[in-house]
Amino acid sequence: MLCQFLMKKTILVSSCLLGCKVRYDKTSKPLPKEQLIALEEKFNLVGVCPEVLGGLPCPRQPAEISRDREVLTQSGQVLSTFFLKGAHKALNICKNYGIQLAVLKSKSPSCGFGKIYDGTFSGCLINGNGITSDLLLKNGVKVINESELDAWLKTVKE
């Protein structure tokens, strides 16, 4: 078993995609079973929720990133410190495990990659990345979201 673990690369995965109820509304958004099995066959998975790592509870108020990159709740509470703390903890996990790829939850103010909510709580999406995705990318960790997973898995060598 240890030998098998050592032979596989390790990747970071948003905990909510693994079925953990860590989202702001205390739900999960699990990957389809087939995708999860394919990931587990090829990789060691390390689940993280940067928001929880940063000290936020479940449930919590939804948050979005404002134009000036502050993370705010709809009531105006500033959560940037929690998000940054969680992002740095996720980066440290990547460094400690030699992780070079993260599969993160789309649209999230922490994990979103490519598209995030615009900060107005209107449901509108804009181009951009979440706090954790940005930090990982700046430190050489490749980031994809769950909608890109099938295409990416096809490129992975056995």
Give the predicted meaning of each segment.
Residues L2-L6, L31-L45, G86-L101:
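Short amphipathic alpha-helices and their capping/turn segments at secondary-structure boundaries
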Residues Q4-L6, L53, Q61-K89, I93, ...:
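Divalent-metal-activated hydrolytic enzyme cores
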Residues M7-I11:
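Extreme N-terminal starter segment of soluble prokaryotic enzymes
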Residues C16, K105-S108, E148:
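Short, well-ordered beta-to-alpha junction loops that form the rim of enzyme active sites
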Residues G19-D25:
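Short N-terminal binding/cap micro-motifs at the start of the first secondary-structure element
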Residues K26-K29, Y117-G123:
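Short glycine-enriched, charge-decorated loop/helix-capping segments at active-site entrances
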Residues K29-T73:
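Short, surface-exposed acidic-centric catalytic microdomains
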Residues K105-T120:
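Internal, conserved structured core segments that host functional sites
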